[in-house]
A protein has these predicted regions:
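Extracellular S/T/G-rich loop segment that most often corresponds to the catalytic His/Ser-adjacent loop
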Residues: 184-254, 258, 262
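Glycine-rich, phosphate-binding/catalytic loops in enzymes
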Residues: 63-68, 161-163, 191-192, 211-212
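Subtilisin-like peptidase catalytic core
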Residues: 82-151, 256, 270-275
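Proline-centered loop/turn at the N-terminus of a beta-strand
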Residues: 46, 111, 170-172, 193
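Divalent metal-coordination and catalytic microenvironments
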Residues: 51, 144, 248
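Active-site core segment of subtilase-fold serine proteases
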Residues: 3-106, 110
């Protein structure tokens, strides 16, 4: 999350004078958006929103929320976590609902699953975050939106293990990079799609960046998002860029259900607005 008055870190890599023209090679140059997701609505794809929860009754979500869970810290449990079923999920801040609404706007028939790992004020432990990712991998999720992260290096290995498990189980993780100029996990792992904000408004306009630490740029400035109590607001941040890419991945996954995360990332590259041949 970010204050709307602050420019998110890494977004300057997607300013109009910084975007690099790139060229797809060989068969990659033949890939088109029509082939990738034309006619797809996300039908049959389950998208997890690992966040503050999701307001299932928000009109911007079109009734597509299909329950979820809360991952809570419990020092008396063997692994310090407790998983609570939430057939009627709620959102404790509005942030998760905002992300879910963006995904729904691109992939209206995808199923939205709430994985609540943040509490009041957007607070939560890294172990809850990792536990939520683990739950998604184990529960028939195809796409996972992560508009949150940690910059603490002590958790590098823990999140790397979960990200690898997602990769080898064909669960595509889409992660917003940090809003401040600091490394964040899991966005830095090569198995994850990392996303920052650009200033454009077209939800289908996105760019590929060949330089670390972020790969893709999607709309994330003054985005109209769903929020608490059925409301909407304008929001700015890398948090709101990631679900644009998650929505596209849901469209691709619905049309081509047997693709691996590696293949999906390659398709996104080939179809980016700054890649010739797309």
């Amino acid at each position: 999350m970010t204050d709307n008055r602050v420019r998110p870190a890494w977004s300057e890599q997607f300013s109009s004078d910084a975007i690099k023209e790139l060229f797809a090679q060989g068969p990659m140059a033949e890939l088109t958006r029509e082939w990738a997701w034309g006619g797809s609505t996300g039908q049959g794809v389950r998208v997890a929103i690992v966040d503050s929860g999701v307001d299932q009754d928000h009109p911007a979500l079109g009734g597509r929320v299909r329950g979820g869970v809360a991952i809570e810290f419990d020092e008396d449990s063997e692994n310090y976590l407790r998983t609570i079923d939430e057939p009627n999920p709620v959102d404790l801040t509005g942030h998760g609902t905002a992300c879910a609404g963006i995904i729904h706007s691109l992939a209206p028939d995808a199923e939205l699953i709430s994985v609540r790992v943040l509490g009041e004020g957007g607070r939560g432990a890294a172990i809850q975050f990792a536990g939520g990712l683990g739950w998604a991998v184990d529960n028939d999720i195809q796409v996972c939106n992560l508009s949150l992260s940690t910059s603490l290096e002590e958790y590098y290995a823990m999140f790397h293990r979960v990200a690898d498990r997602a990769y080898f189980n064909n669960v595509m993780l889409i992660s917003a990079v940090n809003n401040i100029p600091a490394p964040s996990y899991p966005s830095l792992y090569s198995s994850v799609i990392s996303v920052a904000a650009h200033e454009g408004k077209d939800p289908f306009t996105y760019y590929y960046n060949p330089d670390p630490p972020v790969e893709f740029g999607a709309p994330g400035f003054d985005v109209k998002v769903a929020w608490s109590n059925g409301s909407t607001m304008l929001a700015t941040g890398n948090s709101y860029a990631a679900p644009h890419i998650a929505g596209l991945v849901a469209l691709i996954s619905a049309k081509h259900p047997n693709l691996t995360p590696f293949q999906i990332k390659a398709i996104l590259y080939a179809c980016a607005n700054n890649v010739k041949g797309s």
